[in-house]
Amino acid sequence: MKTVSGKKLCGILQAKGWRSIRVHGSHHIFTKEDRDERICVPVHGNSDLKIGLQKAIMKIADIKDDDIY
């Protein structure tokens, strides 16, 4: 699995229909109208997310490995 930065994952989430509802410090909060979950993505410059956090976010958002470009 390719790791990505928080910035890039935010772009992928928006492309999948998630919208940013607010930013608290360096954490971007996303929601989707047909879902009850919220996703918090840390954006710390261009550093990659740790693999466990990235997998958890991808699982909630139904993002496949092929969607990471």
Question: Where do the protein language model's features map onto the residues?
Answer:
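C-terminal structural segments of small proteins and small subunits
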Residues: 45-69
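Active-site beta-strand termini and strand-to-loop segments that position acidic
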Residues: 30-34
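Short, charged/polar, Gly/Pro-enriched secondary-structure boundary elements
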Residues: 35-39
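Histidine-centered active-site/metal-ligand motif
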Residues: 27-28, 44
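N-terminal first-folded block
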Residues: 1-24
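Gly/Ser/Thr-rich beta-alpha loop segments that engage phosphate groups in nucleotides
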Residues: 8, 27, 54
